[in-house]
Amino acid sequence: MAVLFLASMLAIVSAKAETRELPSKKAPLIVETLATGLNQPWSVEALPDGAYLVSEKGGTLRLVRGHHISAPISGVPEVATTGQGGLLDIALAPDFAKSRTLYLTYSARGDGGSGTAVAKAKLSVDGTKLEDTTRIFLMSRLTPRGQHFGSRIAITKDGSLFFGIGDRGESERAQDPRDHAGAILHINPDGSPHADNPFLGSPDGLAEIWSKGHRNPQGLAI
């Protein structure tokens, strides 16, 4: 699965449509171009029907089906595109085939600057819009800095979300348990802290934090 996902990512950003083999001692790798003409694609998520959702850093979400790229999907939250910020990861809820629910990470504006946020939404049946889009999480201590937003999402069997936030360009923040920066966080589908988190109910750290000390986590898998 990881190899196939990597191949898909490489294909999305390829300059021209082609299928080619890459030499490897461990396993055969085939890279197939799925689409061209995307603008800074950041994340690719496969849908049950074989299509792909692709986030573009500038704040656009598109559906790729076959070799066709859709018009921008409406209903995407507004993003802050400062520096490395923008529309980031996409993850489907475990029951997506029935509920059409998905999650997005992105950089959001707020008092003091911007920071990593998580939104929950439903993809319309025709794939043209997000419905009921709601921000369920926004990190603490926003800053005008444009570095290290993270972020990847990994969803567990119970539907809860792990996701990463970078240190926002200030390494000392990754060592502060009262700061969401530089952390892996674990939340429920409604944005509340997960019951297994180490600082839940403690004054020593923020309840959403699962682990600290991460510079800019952009890979996460369960």
What name fits each language-model region?
Residues 2-11:
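Bacterial N-terminal signal peptides
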Residues 15-172, 219-222:
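Acidic, Gly/Ser/Thr-rich repeat motifs that build Ca2+-stabilized beta-propeller blades
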Residues 117-126, 177-190:
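Beta-propeller blade signature
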Residues 154-160, 186-195:
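A structural motif
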Residues 165-167, 188, 214:
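Short, structured patches in soluble enzyme cores that scaffold and shape functional sites
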Residues 168, 189-205:
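Short pre-catalytic segments that frame enzyme active sites
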Residues 205-222:
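Repeat-solenoid scaffold signature
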